[in-house]
Swiss-Prot record:
GO terms, molecular function: D-ribose pyranase activity; intramolecular lyase activity; monosaccharide binding
Name the UniProt record assigns to this protein: D-ribose pyranase
Known role: Catalyzes the interconversion of beta-pyran and beta-furan forms of D-ribose.
Lineage of origin: Bacteria, Bacillati, Bacillota, Bacilli, Lactobacillales
GO-annotated biological processes: D-ribose catabolic process
Active-site residue numbers: 20
Segments passing through the bilayer: none
C-alpha cells in the first residue's frame, strides 16, 4: 500500500502523466464537465473536500506556471481568490477570463477534479510548468 503522496489512484495517475503546459481543472460542485473530458469526482458532501484542500495537495505535487480563473471570482468570492493567490509561487502567471470562457477551456484539460466546494466561482485551471 502506498504510504506517501497522492493516495487517490485516478488523481495520482493524472499528476504522474502531466507534461509541460498540460492543464487540469479543480472545480466546485456546480461546474459542468464537458463530455469526453476525464472526471475525477472527489466530492463526498457539500463542502467536503474543499477546493482549498485539493489545491493544497495539487500544488504540493505539481509545478504550476500559470493559472486561469473566472473574472467573476474577484467580486463574488474574494476570500477564495485571496487564498489562491497567497499559495502561488513567485512567477506564476494569473489569467482571468469569463466564467463561460473558463468552462469552454475545460474542453482541453487532461481532467476536471470535482470537489465538494459549494462557494461561487471556486474553479481553477492549472497549467503545468517544467522543472528543467
Amino acid at each position: 500500500m502506498k504510504k506517501h503522496g497522492i493516495l487517490n489512484s485516478d488523481l495520482a495517475k493524472i499528476v504522474d502523466d502531466l507534461g509541460h503546459t498540460d492543464r487540469v481543472c479543480i472545480g466546485d460542485l456546480g461546474l459542468p464537465i464537458p463530455s469526453g473530458v476525464r472526471k475525477i469526482d472527489l466530492s463526498l458532501k457539500a463542502g467536503f473536500p474543499s477546493f482549498q484542500d485539493l489545491l493544497d495537495v495539487y500544488l504540493e505535487h505539481v509545478l504550476v506556471e500559470k493559472i486561469i480563473l473566472a473574472e467573476e471570482i474577484k467580486e463574488q468570492n474574494p476570500e477564495q481568490l485571496s487564498q489562491i493567490l497567497r499559495k502561488l509561487d513567485d512567477g506564476v502567471t494569473v489569467e482571468y477570463v469569463s466564467h463561460e470562457q473558463l468552462k469552454a477551456l475545460n474542453q482541453d484539460v487532461k481532467a476536471v477534479i470535482r470537489t465538494g466546494e459549494n462557494t461561487p466561482y471556486s474553479n481553477i485551471i492549472l497549467q503545468s510548468g517544467v522543472t528543467i
